[in-house]
């Protein structure tokens, strides 16, 4: 799936609030799982294996699936797209940073560097998730995206979010 300004995105259990948005940044605590601290996590509504599917299959926070936010992103949004394992390797070569706390791999994504390069978010496609979740034949230096679980995006920049609608009751 290609993400365009027409693609409807969804996040569950969150009524997006611009005032409470926490900008994404590199996290020493989360770097080993290749996730930034902050940002807004979402999946395409039309995804064949998105957040709602993973939560339902794993019986994870299913109560949160009753409410959330639907939105789109602006046409000029710049996304780092990981649609295959080679895309992840290229991103690790360009934006990789050493993290020796990671037992098996020495390079993880440096989200501060990705953001500094002007990216508004990162999109892991369904095929990208399949290939990058637990690759068995990658180079020893390369980490994976095992903790991403499904086709998803993490948005670093709240200013690209538009056409917001809420559903369900807001969780406090």
Annotate each predicted stretch with a short phrase.
Residues 41, 49-54, 141, 148:
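A residue-identity detector for tryptophan
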Residues 2-28, 57-172:
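Active-site and NAD+-binding cores of ADP-ribose-processing enzymes
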Residues 44-46, 84:
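Helix N-cap/beta->alpha junction signal
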Residues 22-43:
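A short, exposed loop/beta-hairpin motif centered on an aromatic-Gly-Thr core
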Residues 46-62:
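Short active-site loop/helix that positions an aromatic residue
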Residues 37, 47-50, 137, 144:
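Acidic, low-complexity intrinsically disordered regions
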């Amino acid at each position: 799936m290609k993400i365009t300004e027409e693609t409807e995105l969804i996040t569950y259990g969150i009524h997006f609030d611009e005032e409470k948005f926490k900008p994404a940044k590199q996290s020493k605590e989360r770097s080993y799982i290749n996730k930034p601290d902050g940002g807004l996590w979402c999946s395409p509504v039309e995804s064949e294996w998105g957040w709602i599917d993973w939560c339902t299959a794993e019986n994870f926070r299913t109560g949160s699936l009753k409410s959330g936010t639907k939105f789109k992103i602006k046409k000029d949004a710049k996304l780092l797209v990981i649609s295959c394992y080679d895309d992840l390797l290229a991103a690790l070569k360009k934006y990789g940073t050493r993290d020796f706390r990671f037992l098996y791999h020495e390079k993880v994504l440096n989200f501060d560097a990705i953001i500094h390069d002007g990216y508004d978010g990162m999109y892991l496609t369904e095929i990208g998730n399949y290939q990058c979740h637990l690759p068995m034949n990658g180079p020893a230096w390369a980490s994976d995206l095992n903790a991403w679980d499904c086709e998803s995006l993490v948005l670093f920049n709240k200013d690209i979010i538009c056409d917001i609608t809420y559903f369900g009751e807001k969780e406090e």
